[in-house]
């Protein structure tokens, strides 16, 4: 493992673009400063700003240059780390794919990575998206150096999961990333507008943060300790007023909202692959992560949370159909609009991505081991439990052993005992790794012994349904499964 890094972004270097240096390592480096109040979902505690490292997984430098996969970790842009992503299997391609140089990267997060504030902006530089700039610095390093690790600098795929997918989209839109990658993978994020913060709102947030910190100039903001910044940032809920999960539309690094780009074609066109898990947007957010939020417990979430739309939602999702269990209802009500956002964005991209294919998937396997210890005994009034294809449950099928956060293991969803992938799950992992690496090499996820995967077209789909076994899901089936026409009508009425 090689560990190139960027210079430490502290003191006068804070709120500025990164610069690069190189060190060789045999173990992972520091994680970037982040909130740690999210239990199993959080990464390890860190206030160390010497964290801008990347990791290289390669099978060697012999033979023809290999495709390159640069991976951006998720975590809402407020937590996460590269250390939990073992790229060894992807580097080999597994039994069905092709050898690939895998590079995982750290980047500044939270208020360290995303802050637009009047005094900083008055310095005349477009540096609100420091985290995106870190990613672009990593991509430039890849272009200059990956050949030494057996990689092809002209065949780079940028991918990520959750916030990593959001950031992949930001780089796809960003003029500053032009020429740095040739394909894109969006895993478990639909990338609609709501994950990006308009500049005016970002400046208001940044000015409020400066006021809360007692700062009246940029020098004061740069002098704040990491501990103080994290304290003010708070946890990612209503009690964390300076937290948001996305990039800032600053007009320069990220010039427009994503769906403006998707519908007008104002992005770099290239082969793309994206999808979500069956219970994305529900699942762990409804049954698990809420108990880690500070503030009042969010256990008995019901359809009443939809305010003016509640009557229509209740009619579409009658509680009786979920055994009168509000937790199970919340999972579906949370997941379906997330799923439908993904379908809408895939449709937009397939319409405007001139000359290049878009591939869509729906990860529906619901029995994978997972890292929330309370999942087997989900707190619900009726005691029901339903295995889930929850947010992040698919990462371990790409990056072997991924377990999220600090629990250290994945747990069987039924027994609660630690376990790894087994049997048909390993076959599914081989297929996904094979598809991802074939896509990285050629822009097409098809290959010998891999499931046939058709390109997505508006109104037809199809989605590759990733399960044991795989199947094909038409656009009409997906629309019906996740009630997309209903959710489109609710968005239109707001």
Annotate each predicted stretch with a short phrase:
Residues 1-64, 227, 232-235, 240-241, ...:
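Catalytic-loop region of hydrolases
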Residues 3-9, 111-113, 281-284, 369-371, ...:
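Short, solvent-exposed loop/turn elements at domain surfaces
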Residues 352, 356, 411-494:
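Alpha/beta-hydrolase-fold serine-hydrolase catalytic core, especially in secreted/extracellular enzymes
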């Amino acid at each position: 493992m090689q560990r190139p890094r960027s210079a430490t972004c502290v003191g006068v270097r804070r709120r500025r673009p990164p610069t690069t240096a190189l060190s060789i390592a045999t173990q992972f480096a520091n994680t970037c400063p982040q909130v740690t109040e999210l239990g199993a979902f959080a990464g390890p505690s860190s206030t160390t700003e010497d964290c801008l490292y990347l990791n290289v997984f390669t099978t060697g430098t012999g033979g023809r240059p290999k495709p390159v996969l640069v991976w951006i970790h998720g975590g809402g842009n407020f937590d996460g780390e590269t250390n939990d992503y073992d790229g060894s299997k992807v580097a080999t391609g597994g039994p069905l794919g092709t050898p690939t140089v895998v590079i995982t990267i750290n980047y500044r997060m939270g208020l360290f990575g995303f802050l637009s504030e009047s005094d900083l902006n008055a310095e005349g530089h477009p540096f609100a998206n420091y985290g995106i700039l870190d990613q672009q610095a990593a991509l430039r390093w890849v272009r200059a150096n990956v050949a030494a690790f057996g990689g092809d600098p002209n065949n780079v795929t940028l991918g990520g999961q959750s916030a990593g997918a959001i950031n992949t989209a930001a780089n796809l839109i960003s003029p500053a990333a032009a020429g740095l990658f040739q394909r894109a993978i969006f895993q478990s994020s639909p990338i609609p507008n709501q994950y990006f913060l308009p500049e005016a709102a970002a400046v208001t947030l940044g000015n409020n943060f400066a006021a809360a910190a007692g700062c009246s100039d940029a020098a004061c903001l740069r002098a704040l300790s990491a501990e103080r910044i994290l304290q003010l940032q708070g946890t990612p809920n209503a009690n964390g007023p300076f937290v948001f999960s996305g990039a800032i539309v600053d007009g320069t690094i990220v010039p427009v909202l994503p769906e403006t780009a998707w519908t007008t074609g104002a992005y770099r066109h290239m082969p793309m692959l994206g999808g979500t898990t069956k219970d994305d947007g529900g699942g762990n957010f409804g049954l698990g992560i809420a108990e880690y939020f500070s503030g009042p417990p969010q256990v008995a979430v019901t359809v009443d949370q939809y305010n003016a739309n509640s009557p229509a939602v209740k009619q579409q999702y009658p509680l009786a159909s979920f055994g009168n269990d509000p937790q199970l209802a919340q999972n579906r009500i949370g997941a379906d609009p997330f799923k439908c956002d993904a379908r809408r964005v895939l449709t937009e991209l397939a319409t405007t991505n001139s000359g290049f294919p878009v591939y869509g998937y729906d990860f529906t396997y619901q029995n994978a081991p997972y890292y929330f210890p309370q999942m087997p005994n989900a707190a619900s009034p009726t005691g029901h439990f339903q295995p889930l294809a929850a947010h992040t449950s698919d990462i371990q099928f790409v990056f072997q052993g991924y377990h999220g956060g600090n629990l250290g293991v994945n747990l069987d969803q039924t027994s609660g005992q630690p376990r790894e992938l087994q049997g048909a799950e390993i076959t599914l992992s081989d297929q996904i790794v094979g598809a991802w690496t074939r896509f990285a090499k050629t822009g097409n996820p098809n290959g010998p012994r891999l499931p046939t995967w058709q390109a997505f077209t508006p109104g037809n789909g199809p989605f590759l349904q990733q399960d044991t076994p795989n199947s094909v899901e038409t656009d009409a089936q997906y629309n019906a499964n996740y009630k997309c026409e209903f959710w489109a009508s609710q968005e239109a009425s707001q």
